[in-house]
Amino acid sequence: SLHDALPILFSAQMILSAISTEKIDKTLETLLSAPVSRLSVLTSKMLAAGVVAALQAVVYMFGMSKMTGGLTEGMGDTSAYESAMENFGLTMSIGQYALVGIQMFVSILISLSLSMVLGALAKDAKSAQTMLLPITFSAMIPYLLAMVVDIRTLSPVIKYIVYAIPFTHTFMASENVMFGNYSLYAGGLIYQIVLLVVCMTVALKIFMSDKIFTMSIGGKQRTRKSFAFKKK
């Protein structure tokens, strides 16, 4: 549902805006030039973002449980309904809710690490908003597909392309744990953790290098154009 995509998008926008604003205002340069380990700076940012991500995952799971519980509030005696839902395997235990929350938490961490890298590439406020588009598309494509088709029934090529998008596994998490597809759930979670390590490694290399102060997407092309204009 849309409740799966919103925490990912909100957290990505939050950290991307923070990093890009710090870079544009030269606050990031001052911070990384201070007599403090850059690893400590990056770690503190990720810890703060991780706490926010954990809170968002908890709020998400609380909202999800309240939403599913609210569907039956106006039905009066719900014992027969609840029994039918249990017979069809359409209920989730606390442990299953926790599994879904864990995958949501990892997905938010992935979006945060990607946002840190993309935010470091922004050269102005306008480009910072554009940098959010890859994460938005990565979240919305599997979300929209999951609404209209069963991703597991797609052709192998398309299915594995969709599986390569890390957020796909988050949108399928509740379905997987509800119907006992724990192998697919575990595979998706392992893939997400590996991708998270890769994204964090890239972010660490960028923040540990002085290139973070000058690197940006499109900056060189703009310089060449301006030089050609001055030459004329």
Q: Which role does the model predict for each range below?
A:
Residues 57-99, 120-121, 148-153, 173-177:
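Short helix-loop junctions at transmembrane helix boundaries
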Residues 2-6:
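Short, small-residue-biased leader/transition segments that mark boundaries at the very start
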Residues 91-137:
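A structural motif at transmembrane helix-loop-helix junctions in multipass membrane proteins
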Residues 36-68, 101:
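Selective transmembrane-helix segments that form parts of the transport pathway or gating/packing helices
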Residues 89-94, 144-194:
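Membrane-interfacial helix-loop-helix junctions in multi-pass membrane proteins
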Residues 117-124, 194-232:
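Junction motif at the cytosolic side of a transmembrane helix
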Residues 12-34, 209:
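Transmembrane helix boundary and interhelical loop/hinge segments in multi-pass membrane proteins
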Residues 11-15, 63, 114-117, 170, ...:
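Hydrophobic/aromatic residues in alpha-helical transmembrane segments
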